[in-house]
Every structure is written in C-alpha cells, then in structure tokens.
Amino acid sequence: MSGNLLRRVRVAEAEPVANRIKRFRLVDTGNAPLSQFSGGSHISVVMRSGDRLMRNPYSLMSSPSDTSSYEISVLNVDDSRGGSRFMHENVTAGSELEIGQPLNLFPALKTARKHVFIAGGIGITPFMSMMDELDGLHSDFELHYGVRSLEDAAYCRELQSRYGARVNIYRQDKGQLIPLTSVLSQQRLGAHMYVCGPKPMIDWALQTAMLLGWPSENLHSEQFSTPPPGKPFAVKLVRSGREIIVRGHQSILEALEQHGIDAPFLCRGGACGQCATSVLACDDFIEHNDHYLTEAEKVSGKKIMICMSRIQSGSITLDL
C-alpha cells in the first residue's frame, strides 16, 4: 500500500561540489548491485533524528548503466524542515542510511525527436542521468542550465567537458538569462521540453512553451516540493480507529509514519496522486499544497494529499 521497500546503504563518498551543495555516493552495505533505474528516477532517503522520521526525495544523477552505486546531490536550503540540513551536518562517508527503490515520474520519452532540457540550480540533477542515458542511445538533446554563479552551480565543467556544445550555461551574476523563446522557437516538430528547478522557473517555462504553441503532451516538469510548516492539528482515522497529532513541522504522512501507520505514498511531493485520501469531516480550511488535485477537487474539500497538505487548526477525519 505504501511506498516501496527500504534498502540499507552506506555512504561511500560525501563531498561539497558547490556552495551549499553536497554530493553523496551510496553503495549497498553488502556491496551487492543496487536496483536498476532509468534516467530521471529518484529515491526517497530515510533520515532519523531523535524521534523524528524524515523522508526526502532526491534525483539519481549517476549513470543508469552502473548500479554499483547511486549518486545524489543535496542542496542545504534556508527553509529546510530538517532533511537537507541533516544530510549536510550529520551524514558523512561511512554513515548508513535507508533508501526506497527508484521511482521515475520524470522519464525522457524515447519517442521524442529531440529533448530540450531546462534546468535551474539544483534542478540539474535529474538531467544528469537522463543525458547519460540518451547519450548512450545516440538521441538528440540539448541542455540550458541557469545558475546564480559558478560558485553556486554544480557540475558545469563536468557537463561541458562531456557533452560540449549541447550544454549551455547562463550565469545570473553575469546578467545572462536563458533565451527561452528563442530556444523553443528553433526546435523541430516532435521535440519535447523538460524543466526542473524553482517553481517560478517551471511556471515561466511551461507558460512560454504553451504561448509558442507547444502541445501540452510535449511538456514535462518536475519539482520536489516540501510541505510548508503550520500549527499542530488532529487527524482522526476512521478505519484504524486512531487519532494522532500532526506537529507543526510535520506533514500528515510523516505523522502517520512516526506512529507506525501504513499510508499510501510514492513521490512525497504532491505530484503523483498516490496519497490522495478521502476527507470524511473537517473542522477547518484545508491548505492544499499539492500539484495534483484540480481546483474543483480542492474546493470540494473531499480529498487531501497527505504528503503535502494540512489544515490550519482543529481536526480532520480521514478514510484511513
């Protein structure tokens, strides 16, 4: 019912690669091959700090053809609820972690005539494995990567060295912006655009493409959102007959997991729909923070994405 089975791994390498960004290489604790994955996949990393249980999704950036290890990059964000800070401050070479099996909600479609990647900041990570995979298939692609500065950017030199003119870097500190309208206007019929980065960048890229007449089925995006904090509230579970308190820094899903309650999830970012749960009663306004439910579904108040959304106070009764 819930997300995939966990696997114990050891951190073989942990190193800074840019301002506030660390790269972690993970291997099986028994040195067995890890599960196969495709470009664009991510894993959930389980972190335990005291009585807190955290699970953060991170894109796999290593080569899909090499399952001897996985590589992820973690940005230490200012408004972290603890996960990225925990990885930066507590996880070093030799540390052991639990991870979920790879999941791909952001694949490069093999039928596309060309792949146009638009990345911002840490949003470069899913494209690392996608480009490796497509390069092996001799598929046509190009990358447009927006960064604040070279000090804040990860893997610029590595990407340019490997892929040459297919990689385009735009530095904000040099006044450079991705010329998106020009980039998209030059693409041939059958090209697909993929964007990953901050939400404003994703919205800008998708809106620009649609204004230029790109079909919606040729547009793909991924954003790993974290549920915003709030005030504590109660969750009543009808089927299990339990009531739990969701603390201010927790999502409903995290609170359920902390109390040993099995609940559905996959992406943990409000995008896949797996954790959509029926609301039977609610004392207060639901703060819908997901990207999955339609506006009509949100207004109805009959569904909630327990990985991202919450109420402001009181209690909510769920069909769990």
Residue ranges and their predicted role:
Residues 2-96, 147-149:
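Ferredoxin-reductase
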